[in-house]
Every structure is written in structure tokens, then in C-alpha cells.
């Protein structure tokens, strides 16, 4: 789509192209994101209020215990409010509150209400175990943009294998309470090897709940300090195929495999440096501030960070943005025939092959998913 001169033109173009009867707030944010990336405005912020959690998921990239935190302390509520205010002054319009489990942070309510006072849209990322009557009433009174609850299984045994706790019944009860309260709630599913066959019951349950659900792909490697890094928590690629075929069956979508000889080889025409810069929102229009006050372009790219508590938000954001613009692009990914379905995540590509290097195994896995008919690329049927 050619760049529109203003938001109204952008929305009209969407209506013409997709016959949308009622443009959404997300459509407006998409337009603002285009502008924000160009101008270097931090439109989206993610705030990891705490690394502490009431779950102990085997594949979690961030959860720490009190012992692992050592003598480090959580930021105070006032410190968070200062960072948030400065981010809002710099252009932030949307904030994700996460953890760990963000509802365990003592100042959650105050921070949440402060974001509301500033006029930011808020997404709450939670495991749902604490989302009881008290929190349901709170969010009814002060509605978020979305509450995203991660579902780790379809029964107590799967929950125990993944999270170390049998909280399945409690989480499902809380999700149903949120739905009954007409709160905007969505389900996230994170496939991993610990779910085993329980993944299919999890997807079926998410479908039966009748709300939006999303199935994520490749897991990013946990932070080294968690003690879970360097381990393979992912499903094999054929496991992802089975999951997506099952999802298609539930959604009434036909899965049509494609003969290998009809598929183009992965990789674009370039094999030498073509430029730099993260190709996602990270460091362009979004940022993450973690529990210890460090600001990252992306929490999965650990070498790009700054300290807004020490140098101020504006200086921290500008530093992170400049470093993000230097991040090497994989030349073979440019104009690759699988570009529209392959991950756009630089952290995952780096996880496969190192910075700026072609992730050959990821290329083969993406081609395999297209061959199996669970992903589709243009002009290939």
C-alpha cells in the first residue's frame, strides 16, 4: 500500500481494498506505526513489572526466583510512573503490562490507573490464575484494551508438566468469569515439548471458549540468568504441522499440501550486505523496559539496552533506536519467496545462525510448513 498522506486517507484506502465497513482502532494504530517508525517515536511500550511469577514454566524466557534476583530490587511504583510519564511525553500511546506475572507486582493497580489517566491503551498479559472476582470487578470498572491469558494445557496434568502447578481448573474458571463480565479477553497458546499430546486439547478448548486465540511459533531462548537457556524447549517442525492442521480442521480451513517440485527455493537474490536495521517494530516504534529498569529494543536482543532511570527516557530511547538501526539484516531474507510467512523476528533468526547470517534450518522449516499446506505463499497453489 502506498503511504497515505493522513489517517483518513489510510482508512479510506483500507475500506476500498478490503471492503471494511467499520475501520478499527487497530487500523489507526497501524497507520500511526508507519509514521512512528519513520520519525523514531516510541508508540508502543512493554513494561515487565516483575520477573516473579506464581507459575514455574519450564520454557519461560524471563521468570526468576527471589534467589536468582540476588540483592537486586524491583523498581518502585514511583520509578515506573516516572518512566511511563516520560515515555508518554515521547509519544507512547499503547502499553503492555507483563511479568513474570504482572498481577503479583504490589503497585499494579496504581500503575494501571496512571496509564489510564494518561490516556494510553493498555494490554494486560497474565497467566489468569490470579484473575479472580476482585480483578474482574477492577477491570470492569477500568477496562483495558485487552486481557491476554496464556493457556498452558487442556487439563491439570498438562498444566503440571508445563508450569509445575495444577491451576487448570482455576484458570478456566477465571477466563469464563472474564467472558461473562464482557471483558475483552484473548487466549495465547505457546506450543512446547512439555505439552505432549495435551496441545490438541488446549487448542480445542480455546476454540470452544468462543474468543480470539493465537498459537505462537518458535520460542525464543530464555535469558541466561533464568537457568533455562541453551535447552531446546521447542516442538519439532512436524509437531507444528500437526498443530496447524488440527487448528485448520477446527476452523473449517482446508489444508492442501503442495508438491515439492512446485515450491521455489528459499532465499532472495542477495548474498551480500544490503543494509542494517531491525525490520520489526523493535527500536523503531516500540520498546521493552524490564523489571530492573533496563530499556531494550526487544527483550530477546540482549545487547541493545540503556538505563532510563540513570540517563532519562529520551536519552535511553535514542541510544536504543540508533543501535537498532545498526543491527545487520540477513541479505538472503530480502525478496525471499517465503518472506510473507517466515518469521520477521531478528532474535529468532540470530538464534538459528548468528547476527546477519542466513538461518538455513529456519529456511528449510518454513519451506516445509508451506509444503505441508499449513502456510501459504503468493502464486503457489
Predicted regions and their residues:
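Radical SAM enzyme [4Fe-4S]-AdoMet core and its adjacent flexible, acidic
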Residues: 2-11, 142-146, 150-296, 300-305
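Flexible mid-to-C-terminal extensions adjoining Fe-S/redox cofactors in radical SAM and related proteins
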Residues: 2-32, 41, 294, 299-381
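Conserved alpha-helical substructure of the radical SAM core
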Residues: 2-146
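Short Gly/Pro-enriched turn/cap motifs at secondary-structure boundaries
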Residues: 37, 275-280, 324-327
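Residue-level preference for beta-strand/loop junctions
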Residues: 41, 51, 280-281, 330
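Cysteine-centered iron-sulfur cluster-binding motifs in ferredoxin-type domains/subunits
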Residues: 48-56, 283-284, 333-340
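Short loop/turn motifs at secondary-structure junctions
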Residues: 56, 91, 143, 184, ...
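Short glycine-enriched, charge-decorated loop/helix-capping segments at active-site entrances
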Residues: 66-74, 161-167, 351-352
Amino acid at each position: 500500500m502506498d503511504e497515505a498522506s493522513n489517517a483518513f486517507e489510510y482508512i479510506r484506502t483500507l475500506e476500498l481494498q478490503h471492503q471494511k465497513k467499520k475501520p478499527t482502532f487497530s487500523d489507526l494504530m497501524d497507520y500511526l506505526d508507519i509514521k512512528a517508525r519513520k520519525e523514531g517515536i516510541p508508540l508502543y511500550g512493554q513494561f515487565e513489572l516483575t520477573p516473579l511469577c506464581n507459575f514455574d514454566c519450564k520454557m519461560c524466557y524471563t521468570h526468576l526466583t527471589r534467589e536468582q534476583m540476588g540483592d537486586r530490587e524491583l523498581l518502585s511504583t514511583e520509578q515506573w510512573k516516572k518512566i511511563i510519564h516520560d515515555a508518554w511525553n515521547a509519544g507512547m500511546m499503547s502499553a503492555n503490562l507483563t511479568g513474570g506475572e504482572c498481577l503479583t507486582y504490589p503497585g499494579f493497580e496504581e500503575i494501571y490507573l496512571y496509564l489510564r489517566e494518561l490516556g494510553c491503551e493498555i494490554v494486560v498479559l497474565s497467566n489468569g490464575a490470579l484473575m479472580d472476582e476482585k480483578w474482574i470487578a477492577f477491570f470492569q470498572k477500568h477496562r483495558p484494551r485487552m486481557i491476554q491469558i496464556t493457556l498452558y494445557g487442556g487439563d491439570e496434568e498438562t498444566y503440571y508438566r508445563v508450569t509445575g502447578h495444577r491451576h487448570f481448573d482455576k484458570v478456566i474458571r477465571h477466563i469464563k468469569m472474564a467472558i461473562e463480565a464482557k471483558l475483552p479477553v484473548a487466549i495465547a497458546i505457546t506450543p512446547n515439548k512439555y505439552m505432549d499430546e495435551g496441545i490438541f486439547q488446549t487448542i480445542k478448548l480455546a476454540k470452544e471458549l468462543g474468543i480470539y486465540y493465537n498459537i505462537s511459533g518458535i520460542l525464543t531462548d530464555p535469558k541466561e540468568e533464568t537457568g533455562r537457556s541453551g535447552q531446546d524447549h521447542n516442538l519439532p517442525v512436524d509437531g507444528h504441522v500437526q498443530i496447524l492442521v488440527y487448528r485448520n480442521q477446527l476452523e473449517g480451513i482446508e489444508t492442501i499440501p503442495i508438491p515439492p517440485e512446485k515450491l521455489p527455493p528459499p532465499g532472495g537474490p542477495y548474498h551480500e550486505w544490503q543494509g542494517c536495521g531491525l525490520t520489526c517494530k523493535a527500536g523503531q516504534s516500540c520498546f521493552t523496559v524490564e523489571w530492573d529498569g533496563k530499556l531494550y529494543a526487544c527483550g530477546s536482543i540482549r545487547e541493545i539496552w540503556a538505563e532510563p532511570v540513570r540517563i532519562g527516557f529520551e536519552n535511553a530511547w535514542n541510544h536504543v533506536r540508533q543501535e537498532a538501526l545498526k543491527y545487520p539484516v540477513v541479505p538472503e531474507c530480502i525478496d525471499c519467496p517465503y518472506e510473507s510467512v517466515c518469521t520477521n523476528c531478528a532474535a529468532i533468526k540470530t538464534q538459528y545462525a548468528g547476527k546477519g547470517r542466513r538461518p538455513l534450518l529456519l529456511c528449510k522449516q518454513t519451506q516445509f510448513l508451506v509444503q505441508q499446506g499449513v502456510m501459504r505463499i503468493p502464486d503457489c497453489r
